Curated annotation (Swiss-Prot):
This is Endoplasmic reticulum resident protein 44.2. The gene is erp-44.2. The thioredoxin domain lacks the 2 redox-active Cys. This strongly suggests that it lacks thioredoxin activity. Disulfide bonds join C184-C233. PROSITE patterns: THIOREDOXIN_2. PANTHER family: ENDOPLASMIC RETICULUM RESIDENT PROTEIN 44, ENDOPLASMIC RETICULUM RESIDENT PROTEIN 44.2. The keyword Iron does not apply. Residues 367-413 are annotated as: Disordered. Residues 22-136 form the Thioredoxin domain. GO terms for molecular function: protein disulfide isomerase activity. Residues 396-413 have a biased composition (Basic and acidic residues). A motif (Prevents secretion from ER) lies at residues 410-413. One of its GO terms (cellular component) is endoplasmic reticulum membrane. Residues 1-21 form the signal peptide.
Length: 413
């Protein structure tokens, strides 16, 4: 073989290595053809759903691509893939994951979709730090029972497991912890401390009841373990905050909101028990939430209420807000369910219009008595426009901003 042939062969080999290396160092295009392979190819797969017609997508794409390059330069051995979906050409993928705005960034861990999207700063530093966090361990270690008692925040949801770290049971727990790391804190003993027991144990510690729930199923059944931990870590009734309200609105279900005094949460449990008792089968139709009545004073104002009236229960349908008429009846069997079912049947809206004048008079009196003013204060109920409706939704205004996203199907929110 002459020198020219050798040089040509070396150049071809170098090109091949470079191309293969680029698969992992740059953002790749995710399609239905490579979907399963890509999602299963790394511990973390970070996906940006973009559309060329969307100005926010056009701004994000070069930042996302640069983030992928920077991340892999700094972390060449990391098990992570950055991928971009051209949502015009690959609409099926967007439909598969219910993408209704662009850009949307989702993360998959061990091939499974994490519920919470990435919604933070769109910068190289922020994006790379996010992927590093997803790759970091989601499990805390303790070397003694005293250390666990001192470091475990009992105001949060905690899962404590005693499992051999070289077994499939621990591998299952690691996968579950990676998915639910933002919903629960996970704890395992150090290798030395863990040898004090030979039995597999998994417990959940409820911050509300201070009770311990023990897992009694098959530790090798990943789906069963995941479902058990998920049911414990994601409660039936959640707290709505300004930080999570955007993602809650995207779940698309009307809010059943229990506004209460943040310094007096004694009735939280009462509300939770009422929801579990009467609305458990409505989990896919209503979103029961707790809200700080001081921070969310604006929705209360729309209902003619102030912090002096707390607790207050209302439904926000993303079109209108409906007030639970008598808080003393919340624990009467059937009343809470009736309130929710009346929303679904349209009865709440119908009843409001049938008694419109009287309700507007009552609302005006309530606002006047509490010194609440709004844009309509000078109008007598009889002079209101004929299409006057229940108080408009406030939480709809907290949905994803059209200053950051191109929103699809706006009428559904």
């Amino acid at each position: 073989m002459n020198l020219a042939s050798v040089l040509l062969l070396l150049a071809a080999c170098h090109l091949s290595v470079s191309v293969n290396g680029q698969e992992h160092k740059e953002a790749i295009e995710l399609s239905m053809a490579n979907h399963d392979h890509v999602l299963g190819s790394a511990q973390v797969v970070f996906v940006a759903f973009c559309a060329d017609w969307c100005p926010f997508s056009r701004r994000l794409k070069p930042i996302f691509e640069e983030s992928a390059r920077v991340f892999h330069q700094e972390n060449p051995q990391a098990s992570a893939v950055w991928a971009i979906v051209d949502s015009q050409r690959q609409a099926d993928i967007g439909d598969k994951y219910f993408v209704n705005k662009y850009p949307t960034m989702k993360v998959f861990v061990n091939g499974e979709l994490i519920t919470k999207e990435y919604r933070s700063t769109r910068s190289v530093e922020a994006l790379t730090n996010f992927v590093k966090f997803q790759l970091s361990t989601a499990i805390n270690e303790f070397s003694s029972q005293d250390q666990l008692n001192q470091e475990m925040d009992k105001s949060k949801r905690n899962v404590v497991a005693w499992l051999k770290k070289d077994g499939p049971e621990f591998a299952n727990l690691k996968k579950v912890a990676s998915i639910l790391r933002e919903d629960c804190s996970f704890w395992v003993p150090t290798d030395h401390f863990g040898t004090q027991t030979n039995d597999n144990k998994l417990s959940f510690f409820d911050p509300d009841s201070n009770e311990e729930a023990k897992f009694t199923g098959n530790f090798n059944d990943y789906d069963f373990v995941k479902q058990w931990v998920t049911d414990k870590c994601i409660p039936l009734v959640r707290e709505v905050t300004f930080e999570n309200v955007e993602e809650l609105t995207e779940e698309g279900m009307p809010f059943l909101i229990y506004f209460r005094d943040p310094d007096n949460k004694t009735t939280d449990k009462v509300f939770g028990e009422a929801v579990a008792r009467e609305l458990y089968d409505q989990r896919s139709a209503i979103n029961p939430l707790l809200a700080d009545g001081h921070k969310f004073a604006h929705p209360l104002k729309h209902l003619g209420k102030t912090k002096e009236d707390l607790p207050v229960l209302a439904i926000d349908s993303f079109q209108h807000m409906y007030l639970f008429p008598d808080m003393t009846q919340m624990n009467i069997p059937g009343k809470l369910r009736e309130f929710v079912m009346d929303l679904h049947s349209g009865k709440l809206h119908k009843d409001f219009h049938e008694n419109l004048d009287q309700r507007m008079i009552e609302l005006a009196k309530a606002k006047a008595a509490r010194g609440i003013t709004d844009d309509h204060e000078a109008q007598a109920p009889s002079t209101r426009p004929i299409d006057t409706t229940p108080p408009p939704s406030v939480f709809k205004e907290l949905k994803p901003s059209d200053k950051r996203y191109s929103i699809l199907q706006k009428s559904e929110l």
